[in-house]
Amino acid sequence: MTTRYIFVTGGVVSSLGKGIAAASLAAILEARGLNVTIMKLDPYINVDPGTMSPTQHGEVFVTEDGAETDLDLGHYERFIRTKMNRRNNFTTGRIYEEVLRKERRGDYLGATIQVIPHITNAIKEKVLAGGEGHDVAIVEIGGTVGDIESLPFLESIRQLGVELGRDRTLFMHLTLVPFLGAAGEVKTKPTQHSVKELRSIGIAPDVLICRGDRAIPANERAKISLFCNVEERAVISLKDVDSIYKIPALLRSQGLDELVVKRFSLTCREADLSEWENVIYQEANPNGEVVIGMVGKYIELPDAYKSVNEALKHAGLKNRVSVTIKYIDSQTVEAKGDEVLQGLDGILVPGGFGERGVEGKILAAKFARENNLPYFGICLGMQVALIEFARNVAGMADAHSTEFNKATPFPVVGLITEWVDEEGNVEQRHEASDLGGTMRLGAQLCHLLEGSKAAQAYKGNSCVERHRHRYEVNNKYKERLEQAGLVFSGLSSDRKLVEMIELKDHPWFVAGQFHPEFTSTPRDGHPLFEGFVAAASAHQKRDLKK
């Protein structure tokens, strides 16, 4: 199979939405019957985002094969059916690490290692490998043209443009076309300078995606075409919209997919965007609203919980309700108590690391349990629910996780190296001292308890979900917790690890050690999120009847 490559760059400012634009184009091409994949090339020196602060970088998206990647890969999976893997995201740090490892082994036979050709060759190899087996590979270059960090990536795609030829490569550049209120017009000069910068390093864009808060007038598009040496039909206006799921139709209406298909001489059907039209209709026509309180640690940056936010919206689509997310700092719960949890239709506690705010999350789980409020715990959200139950129901007053209190008399949650075996002996397992790459990662099979809410949600006796954690439920306390009424509704493939818990006599109190948000999509939703939002809606209706 001959793969065609579309390289997506950005200019003027960051956060223009390259990932959304790339994913939207991929969705249109997929709707035309093409096999499409998307890659993200990140210019930072970190090997991967696994140890980066969520408040700086946003969430870490975990792929099926366990790669810790950029959150843009979440957008990719939500827009197209192709599943991402570790070949779809790599960083400058990863490239340098691999090149230096080869140099230490002597693979370069004593040559002087340089950015060109050694680093650029390594980048090209990864791009070509990532595109194998697909009709079209869209490659997003992180950062902004002009950044010193991006230069090796830009040089690499310039070389690929020459080596593969125009019939296999296309360069798409996103720029900002701002509107100046004082002048009453849009300004094209930033776009002209951005394209000039790109051309100075040898890349001539074939398509310009012009971002702005309004549609670009025809005369300004003609002006951009003239000064940037791009066909007028290839100057695409991409205005702000109230839903990112409207963007595929917006790009298609301007013929972007047809331009790509003709450039690559591809034979394929017309795009069928009916699934996306259905998503847009559901989003615009809810039959009600629910308020979900998300009790977390990183709420100052919503992107830290990007996939959770989107999964809640998807569940709203499936339940025909609008989901309003109320972000609640878990430290605020610690300081003010449950008064900040009033008026909610459901509580969700997402994943996280570190001790800060954990008692607030435990209080949130207690509030939901005692008030029959729908509760959904994800990763740490499951662990705090278990800790709360152990303390206040099972009689283990000082129960905790060894992540937060190594001296706890009831370590109901322990590090993966601290598991207790079936005879009650502490089993120490080896763990590298580095934080990066030492977690349980990727898709894992989970067996579901027959008749449980989890099994009802999945409509089956098993599921496959993605993990990202170092701590597990300590099996030493499993029997005692079960006797107190906790239901262990999900177990690992070998049935030795607890994957899900729930409460029997509660409208909807379900938690999982995994991250179901990573597999939710606007077209398909996710069973657990759908069940949670349905329970929140039912809770609201019960309150209204009182």
Swiss-Prot record:
What reaction(s) does this enzyme catalyze? Answer: UTP + L-glutamine + ATP + H2O = CTP + L-glutamate + ADP + phosphate + 2 H(+); L-glutamine + H2O = L-glutamate + NH4(+); UTP + NH4(+) + ATP = CTP + ADP + phosphate + 2 H(+)
Tree of life domain: Bacteria
User: Binding residues for Mg(2+), per the UniProt record?
Assistant: 72, 140
**InterPro entries attached here?**
Class_I_gatase-like, CTP_synthase, CTP_synthase_N, GATASE, GATase1_CTP_Synthase, P-loop_NTPase
Q: Where does L-glutamine bind?
A: 352, 380-383, 403, 470
Q: Which UniProt keywords apply?
A: ATP-binding, Glutamine amidotransferase, Ligase, Magnesium, Metal-binding, Nucleotide-binding, Pyrimidine biosynthesis
Query: Tell me, what controls this protein's activity?
Result: Allosterically activated by GTP, when glutamine is the substrate; GTP has no effect on the reaction when ammonia is the substrate. The allosteric effector GTP functions by stabilizing the protein conformation that binds the tetrahedral intermediate(s) formed during glutamine hydrolysis. Inhibited by the product CTP, via allosteric rather than competitive inhibition.
Per UniProt, the enzyme's principal EC class comes to ligase
Pfam name, any one: GATase
Write out the residues that bind UTP: 14, 187-192, 223
Report the GO terms under cellular component: cytosol
Q: Which EC number(s) does UniProt give? A: 6.3.4.2
Q: Which residues bind ATP?
A: 15-20, 72, 239-241
Q: Which residues form the Glutamine amidotransferase type-1 domain?
A: 291-542
- Write down the SUPFAM superfamilies for this protein, in alphabetical order: Class I glutamine amidotransferase-like, P-loop containing nucleoside triphosphate hydrolases
CDD domains in UniProt: CTPS_N (cd03113), GATase1_CTP_Synthase (cd01746)
- Which residues are connected by disulfide bridges in this protein? none
Where does the record place the region Amidoligase domain? 1-266
Q: In which pathway does it act?
A: Pyrimidine metabolism; CTP biosynthesis via de novo pathway; CTP from UDP: step 2/2
Which ranges form a coiled coil?
A: none
Picking any one GO molecular function of the record gives: CTP synthase activity
Q: Which residues bind CTP?
A: 14, 147-149, 187-192, 223
Quaternary structure per UniProt?
Homotetramer.
User: PANTHER family annotated for this entry?
Assistant: CTP SYNTHASE, CTP SYNTHASE-RELATED
Q: Which NCBIfam families match?
A: PRK05380.1, PyrG
**Protein name per Swiss-Prot or TrEMBL:** CTP synthase
Organism of provenance: Shewanella oneidensis (strain ATCC 700550 / JCM 31522 / CIP 106686 / LMG 19005 / NCIMB 14063 / MR-1)
- List the top taxonomic levels of the source: Bacteria, Pseudomonadati, Pseudomonadota, Gammaproteobacteria, Alteromonadales
